[in-house]
């Protein structure tokens, strides 16, 4: 199986969730072995997508370099990962990626418009050999050995619209688009005033998030999936796993996970070199199976 990029440049204009300012996003092809590279057009600064460039995970995943930063990148990265894209220039003219509708389906549609093309260099993956876990009290995230990419997530909120939710998802591009991509970010009315006092959630609305009061959901259209809340947690984690730079072969288990825990797991995994191996997907039989995973179903 070969590395992939997009067939042509595509662009979209939106607003950032936390800063609420307009942003112009452009996606452009890059040569093989380039990786995923963010570029702040307004500042002229490139920020390669690497764990060392993560500077904050409080409310979103934020990367930065040379005084430039780009935040709320997880939904965009989730779609890029799901489409198996290895090399891409991600150019923005502001400090936050567009929130779209709070999910990643808009980015999937943008990638469909661009088209996905194979390159000459072989694709690589990080295959888990032994479990790695990161905990924060009762909360934890863990990766385990597996022959497929599988996400087994659970959350628990003391709210009548959420309570306990679990979802088990075997990764493929087609399944991602059907089961995960439309799951929206969510927040609570009682948190909004505090967040806005901190300069956050300024672009949030019922058009780009599930909003909950004390008793239920304020969005008139309701939920897109029965377990939309936990499915969005999977969407976020897939985006955070894109920081590895190559796809993960293993099972990702999470209870009450967060951007912070996802990032700590990535750092811990890369530190424990005996817990994984980098595999080339050149083996014909294995490549055929991986190609099936990244088939879009279009």
Curated annotation (Swiss-Prot):
Lineage top rank: taxon: Bacteria
Which biological process, per GO, is one annotated for this protein? Answer: lipid A biosynthetic process
Task: Name the Pfam families on file.
Answer: LpxC
Q: Which GO terms describe its molecular function?
A: metal ion binding; UDP-3-O-acyl-N-acetylglucosamine deacetylase activity
Looking at the UniProt record for this protein, which Gene Ontology cellular component terms does it annotate, in alphabetical order? Answer: membrane
Q: Does the keyword Metal-binding apply?
A: yes
Q: Which of UniProt's keywords are assigned here?
A: Hydrolase, Lipid A biosynthesis, Lipid biosynthesis, Lipid metabolism, Metal-binding, Zinc
Pathway per its UniProt entry is: Glycolipid biosynthesis; lipid IV(A) biosynthesis; lipid IV(A) from (3R)-3-hydroxytetradecanoyl-[acyl-carrier-protein] and UDP-N-acetyl-alpha-D-glucosamine: step 2/6
Binding residues for Zn(2+): 75, 232, 236
- What EC number(s) are associated with this protein in UniProt? 3.5.1.108
Required cofactor names: Zn(2+)
Top EC category? hydrolase
**Which residues catalyse the reaction?**
259
Catalytic reaction equation(s) = a UDP-3-O-[(3R)-3-hydroxyacyl]-N-acetyl-alpha-D-glucosamine + H2O = a UDP-3-O-[(3R)-3-hydroxyacyl]-alpha-D-glucosamine + acetate
Instruction: Cite the InterPro entries for this sequence.
Output: Ribosomal_Su5_D2-typ_SF, UDP-acyl_GlcNac_deAcase, UDP-acyl_GlcNac_deAcase_C, UDP-acyl_N-AcGlcN_deAcase_N
What does this chain do?
Catalyzes the hydrolysis of UDP-3-O-myristoyl-N-acetylglucosamine to form UDP-3-O-myristoylglucosamine and acetate, the committed step in lipid A biosynthesis.
Task: State the similarity comment.
Answer: Belongs to the LpxC family.
Q: What is this protein called?
A: UDP-3-O-acyl-N-acetylglucosamine deacetylase
Organism of origin is Wolinella succinogenes (strain ATCC 29543 / DSM 1740 / CCUG 13145 / JCM 31913 / LMG 7466 / NCTC 11488 / FDC 602W) (Vibrio succinogenes)
* This protein's encoding gene: lpxC
